[in-house]
Amino acid sequence: MAVTNEVQLQVNNIHMAFGGVQALMGISFEVKKGEIFSIIGPNGAGKTVLLNCINGLYHPQKGKVEFDEKDITQSRPYQRAKMGISRTFQKLELFKGATVLDNIRLGRHIHLKTGLLSGSLYFGKTAREEIEHRDFIEREIIDLLEIEHIRDKMVGMLPYGLQKRVELARALALNPKIILLDEPLAGLNLEEVEDMARFILDINEEERWQTTCVLVEHDMGVVMDISHRVMALNFGEKIAEGTPLEVQKNPNVIKAYLGEAEDLYVTRR
């Protein structure tokens, strides 16, 4: 998807504290429609806290979050999901005793419009909705993420790398405008990392999806390869923002990661 000048997500002067610990201090940035916008920083920099403020798990003590020019600072997570904000997590939030297909279906529930009675009896509009949603999942998501062979397997029996795909699939089932990806590459081997990076690019670039991505990730090689812009945090403060090249050469970023090393990025290619 081509990056536009349209601002889709805007974060203004966010402050978040837990007791006496300042997790975020005056964070401001904007994400344009069609971007892969990555957030980097050492452990404890505030990256996940920031995602939690964007999707509504946390409400900041100060500042504002806007999505599609609407103030969503006090909106609940389900309200933001209805607006088109989806999310994956560092710690997988899957139902291990359910099948892959059932886990993915949970991401579609917000689009269901039938009532309780017709839903329980499964007739008429309910049946049509079920067919439509199942078709969307099978035709678009399962095919995209190459998980047809595991669709009926219990999630808890799958290797970790495939569970990561299932969580991404469930987030995509919302058919989001923007997806927040919290360390999607963590714990994956090299082949799985390359596959996941390809999936993220497909989600962003393919005409069917064209989804804006906000990526929190520690794999600097992938971040620098696929991002349009990057923001760096350290101890709850923004220390840099710009193109991947600008950020990887920024002395504050290099110092935060590697002391006084010459360059942050060592290419994998």
Residue spans for each PLM region:
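Glycine-rich phosphate-binding loops of nucleotide-dependent enzymes
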Residues: 2-269
